[in-house]
Amino acid sequence: MLGAVKMEGHEDWSSYYGEPEAYSSVGNMNAGLSMNPMNTYMSMSAMSTSANMTASSMNMSYVNTGMSPSITGMSPGTGAMPGMGNGVASMASHLSPSMSPMSAQATSMNALAPYTNINSMSPIYGQSNINRSRDPKTYRRSYTHAKPPYSYISLITMAIQQSPSKMLTLSEVYQWIMDLFPFYRQNQQRWQNSIRHSLSFNDCFLKVPRSPDKPGKGSFWTLHPDSGNMFENGCYLRRQKRFKCDKKPSLREGGGKKLSEGASSVGSVGNSSSERSVGNESPHSSSSPCQEQKRSLVDMKSSHGLSPEHATSPASQAQHLLSQHHSVLSHEAQSHLKPEHHYSFNHPFSINNLMSSEQQHHHHHHHHNHQHHHKMDLKAYEQVMHYSGYGSPMAGSLAMSTVTNKSGLEPSPISSDTSYYQGGYSRPIMNSS
């Protein structure tokens, strides 16, 4: 290898590669060729060193061209190998007069047999396989830092269930997640905010205040006793069904345990649309949405806490409004059953059809005063634009008044009749055929 170092130095070739050193290098080449054919990687390296040396010193450029493509693996065909063997044999016959050309030919062809040719090329590919095998290690190392396929509810549930007391503080939940998943050791403010939201807005987590024998900071969080079947068969990748707290009616008496905090905030993530429509705009901001639903059910069944006007049935309330506001009674009765005051049409997938009657009654109870300001504007808009919804009784009165050349603002007698059929569609008589 001294020759290789000197060759990189770009010094005079003749001073380093004289006759004795050339003979010794050919002897090393023959020794390398006569080695075991299975150890072909060492023999090929010996051949490449000696061939480059002798080709440079003896100006035998054809040997170098015959050797280099097969060594570098650019053309590992069998055609380049016999040429290399012949070049080595001729080189050996020129340099070593005492060695017969046939022995050098036999030795070189023995090392470059077709079966050995495959083995001689395999160390080159094996080296690339070694380099390629290092990549999955780095990939696996980065894969451990990837985001785990668990939702925040799954992470909180796993953390609580592995604790001996089955309850953890918020900081203990954070620490458990960071210890188990390295991904959550960065961007802590972002995902910890999501953890707090998941704890607050999901009914499956209960907030337990600290007892006097456990001093410290922060309340404990535990799982709801009825939420054990959220993750079936212990698989935390997908939650089977959302847990609702209305399955346990005795939760209203649990004074210290609040199932949810901040139910009056507008952007409540994790709540369904019915819970948002009831819980977010209710005046009872300290209680949970499911408690609001239960309270609305109780208010519908027993009328304490409500005025006599709102405690009555929807039909009697519509009749009560008939005696007071005859001009807008149809729209008031319609909007009572469909409490969304921004729209007057009845879409099949609107929130009005998806909400139950108890939720609609409770929702209307809080929006009654707000609707009173909008009903005149909506009526005037419908009559001016000559366009109203399918389910609005004003459609029949407007179309009938238009067909019979009446004034658009004149109330039609048909509006008083359609107020008793709020559930059906009112269509113009002229277009019914």
From Swiss-Prot:
Residues 247-260, 292-302 have a biased composition (Basic and acidic residues). One of its GO terms (molecular function) is protein domain specific binding. One of its GO terms (cellular component) is nucleus. Residues 407-421 have a biased composition (Polar residues). SMART domains: FH. Pfam families: Forkhead, Forkhead_N, HNF_C. Transmembrane segments: none annotated. This is Forkhead box protein A2-B. It comes from Xenopus laevis. The lineage of its organism: Eukaryota, Metazoa, Chordata, Craniata, Vertebrata.
